[in-house]
Curated annotation (Swiss-Prot):
Highest taxon in the source lineage: Eukaryota
Matches recorded under PANTHER family: ORNITHINE DECARBOXYLASE ANTIZYME
Molecular function terms from GO: ornithine decarboxylase inhibitor activity
Gene Ontology terms describing biological process: positive regulation of protein catabolic process; viral translational frameshifting
Protein name: Ornithine decarboxylase antizyme
Role noted for this protein: Ornithine decarboxylase (ODC) antizyme protein that negatively regulates ODC activity and intracellular polyamine biosynthesis and uptake in response to increased intracellular polyamine levels. Binds to ODC monomers, inhibiting the assembly of the functional ODC homodimer, and targets the monomers for ubiquitin-independent proteolytic destruction by the 26S proteasome.
A single cellular component GO annotation: cytoplasm
Subunit structure and binding partners: Interacts with ODC1 and thereby sterically blocks ODC homodimerization.
Transmembrane segments: none
Amino acid sequence: MSSILSSNFTNKSNQLVNESAVDSSLTASPCSTQPGDVGWCFDAPHGVLTKLPNETRAIVSAVSPNWRVTSIGEKTLAIMIPHDQPVLGISKKNFVDLLEFAEDKLEMERVLAVFEKARINPTEGFPRTLRYVGFRPYAIDEHPVHLPAEKYFIMSYKV
């Protein structure tokens, strides 16, 4: 799949990533209880999550500023999506750009959409929409240890 990114992202992706261009805050998002905040965090141990280029966060934020992203291992990109993510208002082009970036630039093998299980219905809303673009529910017995099936509903997309 060839990547068609906007010129802002294309210029940045041509630069080499060095240590200063890596966002260390992506190893874990702090939990927040402030009004308006999404109210969840990645609760994986620091050694499990991998640093990503700042460019990754910019591309994810172009889809939705409320999404959080990290890499689990070398070949899996995980995106935490708030339970109240509206279906409307998400740019289809930006979402496809994100999937292409994960494949072409980050060389990921899969993208995980992670939802708090207690706060969503897997057959409605945004999880339902993701099924139309090729995301499939992740088998409960395949959940990463730090994203337990009791707490998270995960959908997987093979890039």
